[in-house]
Regions:
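Internal helical hairpin/lid segments
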Residues: 199-266
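Glycine-rich phosphate-binding loops that contact phosphosugars or nucleotide phosphates
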Residues: 15-151, 156, 194, 242-267
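Glycine-rich, charge-decorated loop segments at or immediately adjacent to ligand/cofactor-binding or catalytic sites
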Residues: 103-115, 229-232, 276-285
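A generic structural motif
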Residues: 50-52, 101, 216-224, 266-275
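Structured C-terminal subdomain patch of bacterial secreted/periplasmic proteins
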Residues: 272-311, 315
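Structural motif
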Residues: 2-6, 55-62, 226-229
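Active-site phosphate/pyrophosphate-binding segments
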Residues: 2-11, 18-19, 138-221, 226, ...
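Short, surface-exposed amphipathic charged segments that create phosphate/polyanion-binding patches used
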Residues: 64-67, 130-135, 233-235, 279-288
Length: 322
């Protein structure tokens, strides 16, 4: 399955798409956010919205209908809220595409198009949800409106594949041990980011650290930092800054300048120091979250070693009834 042919088939079968809804939960929803950001910014003849799946079901958009494209993701394939969202969308006449890592799971039931993807550190970024999502978004843009950066998107994903191995080594060598040490020293800390990268600011907090490390932390949008949260800044408080290389970098730089003079514990992960600046500027903002996700994986693993806490351990998820 590939994004170009899939989108072409949908348009031929259903006609012009008028709205796109991205639905998932947790890390799977986060994977869809950069694609939504691409469409929010670039699309002029249709709309795009991302939903956590339960909210999509409880507050179903009135615009959901035969001209809608619903793109869902459930890594396990068994997230009931996502399956329910797909069922609701199908009943409304929408075109449904569901992504999953698990063939034969609840979501891979033959009722809609299912894209079963591989998973693992060695997989191409174009073959996993973040990459699949931005490619579907880019193809939809191109086939309905024209998208000059389509070739850059494909090329940029290949560049991400090329730069990630060295980036993983670098972040472990330069930040891994110190990050784990700071987690020992600070029971709570803040993570800042913005733009499409904010998906991974959110992800680092709720997935890599709260879910996988039971680490108390909070995410803050860099653009919102000066509209309330900066009042809590003081010496002894740890801040982790995701410094992107795209259009929103000035927001992070402004926040970082304030942090450097008002607290004594700041760690910066600067995408430009890891080769991300070589990715075409036209698409970099939408691909950079891939970089921050992969670096978060390395940092949570570094913390896990020091705390003897495997990222695979859960105490509630899939164990208790909730």
């Amino acid at each position: 399955m590939n994004a170009h042919d899939l989108i072409q088939e949908i348009i031929e079968r259903k006609g012009k798409v008028e709205n796109v809804f991205w639905i998932a939960c947790g890390g799977s929803m986060i994977d869809l956010m950069p694609a939504n950001e691409l469409l929010k910014r670039e699309a002029t003849t249709f709309t795009s919205t991302v939903y956590t799946a339960r909210e999509f079901c409880l507050m179903a958009p009135k615009s959901l209908g035969p001209k809608s494209l619903v793109i869902a993701c459930s890594h396990s394939g068994n997230t009931q809220e996502v399956v329910d969202g797909c069922e609701m969308a199908l009943a409304a006449g929408a075109e449904v595409v569901a992504m999953t890592d698990c063939e034969g799971s609840k979501i891979d039931n033959g009722k809609w198009t299912t894209w079963v993807y591989p998973w693992g550190k060695g997989e191409s970024q174009a073959e996993v949800p973040q990459g699949i999502g931005v490619l579907m978004a880019a193809e939809l843009l191109d086939q309905q409106e024209g998208y000059e950066a389509l070739a850059d998107m494909y090329a940029g994903l290949k560049q991400m594949d090329a730069l990630l191995p060295a980036a993983r080594e670098k972040v472990n060598a330069e930040l891994g041990d110190r990050f784990a040490e700071l987690c020992q020293q600070h029971k709570f800390f803040y993570i800042l980011g913005s733009g499409p990268n904010f998906s991974q600011t959110y992800a680092m907090a709720i997935c890599s650290l709260m879910e996988m490390q039971w680490q108390h932390c909070c995410y803050i949008h860099s653009g919102e930092y000066f509209h309330g949260p900066f009042e809590a800044t003081e010496p002894g408080v740890f801040y982790f800054v995701q410094l992107g290389s795209g259009e929103c970098r000035p927001m992070e730089e402004r926040a970082l300048a304030f942090l450097n003079t008002h607290t004594d514990t700041v760690m910066v992960l600067d995408a430009l120091e890891y080769g991300v600046g070589d990715v075409p500027a036209s698409v970099r903002s939408y691909l950079e979250p891939i970089f921050f996700y992969n670096m978060s994986c390395e940092l949570r693993a570094a913390r896990g070693k020091v705390f003897d806490h495997s990222p695979e351990i859960r105490r509630y998820m899939g164990i208790e009834q909730y």
